[in-house]
Curated annotation (Swiss-Prot):
InterPro entries: Ribosomal_uL18_bac-type, Ribosomal_uL18_bac/euk. One of its GO terms (cellular component) is cytosolic large ribosomal subunit. This is Large ribosomal subunit protein uL18. It holds the Pfam family Ribosomal_L18p. Gene3D superfamilies: 3.30.420.100. Keywords: Ribonucleoprotein, Ribosomal protein, RNA-binding, rRNA-binding. HAMAP family: Ribosomal_uL18_B. Signal peptide: none annotated. Part of the 50S ribosomal subunit; part of the 5S rRNA/L5/L18/L25 subcomplex. Contacts the 5S and 23S rRNAs. Belongs to the universal ribosomal protein uL18 family.
Length: 122
């Protein structure tokens, strides 16, 4: 269990270091990713107003209805495409990618690749 808590503490330290440098504005909001053991979440956030402009997760009805039990990297890529499409509907094409302390590998990388495929630039 000690290993698990040190992993969490290390991720939170990385998150603080990243968050000092990354902020989202109205013209270039922040694409924030959260990864749990079972699901992945993505939000496009304007930090100036503190509002979420677009969001998607593996718990969305639209994702569950259209996808046949996608898991892992495939689900993350689909969520990246979904959040990218929702951001483009709102007129957002440029974002700042916030990996939220998670390593840029696996599902986090797959989500960013899916968002780039949808047309987001970062």
């Amino acid at each position: 269990m000690a290993n698990k808590s040190t992993r969490l503490v290390s991720r939170l330290k990385r998150q603080k270091r990243i968050r000092k440098r990354i902020t989202g504005t109205g013209e270039r909001p922040r694409l924030c990713v959260f990864r749990s053991s079972a699901h992945i979440y993505a939000q496009v956030i304007d930090d100036v107003t503190g509002s979420t402009l677009a969001a998607a997760s593996t718990l969305d009805k639209e994702f569950i209805e259209n996808k046949d039990k996608l898991v892992g990297k495939d689900a993350a890529t689909a969520i990246g495409r979904l959040v990218g499409a929702r951001a483009l509907e709102k007129g957002i094409s440029k974002v700042v990618f916030d990996r939220n302390g998670f390593l840029y590998h696996g599902r986090v990388k797959a989500l960013s690749d899916g968002a780039r495929e949808a047309g987001l630039n970062f």
